[in-house]
């Protein structure tokens, strides 16, 4: 295969990550690759000054630091993508450790058109024997990790913690959902949207990165935001029956109240646009991946 000059923009959304940002970048810069890349850090109103070290000259010329005012992880990633210079976008959490040539191996799957989006296997930093290979959903729309399969394979859900996507594919589906103001379901929504628009999402089990699974978030995550995102996702992509089932999953808050908020925010306009432009419907998606919902 003739090597083309594909370059990668690596985008890290950051909020109150403490020493993780520095550790992650140290791992990245020490890891072998033949691929040229840029690093974009979107510091979304961190309160712990975790990105201040990037002002030092040693890091300054290696990293493009963007500061945002608490826009949430979805929009922070989109802002990073808009600033990206290269044709491939690699979204990463700011608490990862890498293996040699991980970027090269992921990029090969896209360059050879084996898939449109790819994630590596993701191991726990605390116990690297625990590894997940892409994700699917259970009957209450909760995440379940796949076991290992030989070779590249399709996955219903791409974990947001580490994945590579062509820039034009990302923007063709409108990026991460701009109506998600807080953390929750942003990778699930993007994955479903990609499949419905006819793009393939895959896991490359030959690449493993380590991810710090945290006991709790370093910033406030509340039920309201998570439920809002869940129901908004349903309104964007699901049929009426599944929208109703999604409302039934809202137990710690008033479903009616959350539904009113979702509808007030103009979700139906975007839904109509998606229904016009997609290649498959939610019925196909849930059947195809054998998700009983």
Task: Name the predicted role of every residue range.
Residues 26-36:
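Short, acidic, metal-binding catalytic loop of nucleotide-sugar glycosyltransferases
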Residues 43-53, 70:
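A conserved acidic beta->alpha catalytic loop
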Residues 74, 146-164:
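A recurrent flexible, glycine/aromatic-enriched loop bordering the glycosyltransferase active site
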Residues 93-97:
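The conserved acidic donor/metal-binding loop of glycosyltransferases
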Residues 101-137:
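Conserved donor NDP-sugar-binding/catalytic core segment of glycosyltransferases
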Residues 68-84:
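Glycine-rich, basic loop-to-helix element that forms the pyrophosphate-binding segment
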Residues 222-293:
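Terminal low-complexity segments of carbohydrate-biosynthetic enzymes
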Residues 89:
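Short aromatic/hydrophobic "clamp" motif used to bind/position activated sugar donors
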């Amino acid at each position: 295969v003739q090597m083309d000059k594909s370059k990668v923009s690596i985008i890290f959304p950051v909020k109150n990550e403490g020493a993780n940002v520095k550790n992650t970048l140290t791992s990245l810069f020490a890891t072998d690759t033949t691929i040229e890349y840029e690093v974009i850090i979107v510091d979304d109103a961190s309160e712990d000054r975790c990105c201040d070290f990037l002002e030092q000259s040693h890091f300054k010329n290696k990293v493009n630091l963007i500061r945002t005012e608490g826009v949430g992880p979805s929009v922070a990633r989109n802002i990073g993508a808009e600033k990206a210079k290269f044709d491939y976008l690699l979204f990463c959490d700011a608490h990862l450790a890498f293996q040699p040539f991980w970027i090269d191996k992921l990029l090969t799957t896209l360059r050879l058109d084996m898939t449109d989006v790819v994630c590596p296997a993701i191991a726990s930093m605390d116990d690297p024997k625990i590894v997940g290979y892409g994700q699917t959903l259970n009957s209450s729309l909760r995440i379940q990790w796949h076991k290992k399969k030989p070779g590249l394979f399709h996955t219903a859900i791409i974990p947001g913690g580490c994945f590579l996507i062509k820039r034009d594919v990302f923007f063709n589906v409108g990026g991460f959902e701009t109506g998600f103001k807080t953390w929750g379901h942003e990778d699930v929504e993007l994955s479903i949207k990609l499949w419905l628009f006819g793009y393939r999402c895959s896991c490359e089990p030959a690449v493993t990165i380590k991810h710090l699974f945290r006991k709790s978030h370093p910033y406030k995550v509340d039920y309201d935001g998570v439920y809002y995102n869940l129901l908004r996702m349903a309104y964007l992509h699901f049929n009426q029956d599944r929208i109703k089932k999604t409302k039934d999953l809202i137990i710690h808050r008033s479903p009616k109240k959350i539904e009113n908020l979702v509808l007030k925010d103009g979700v139906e306009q975007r839904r109509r646009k998606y229904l016009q432009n997609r290649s498959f419907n939610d019925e196909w998606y849930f059947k195809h991946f054998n998700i009983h919902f």
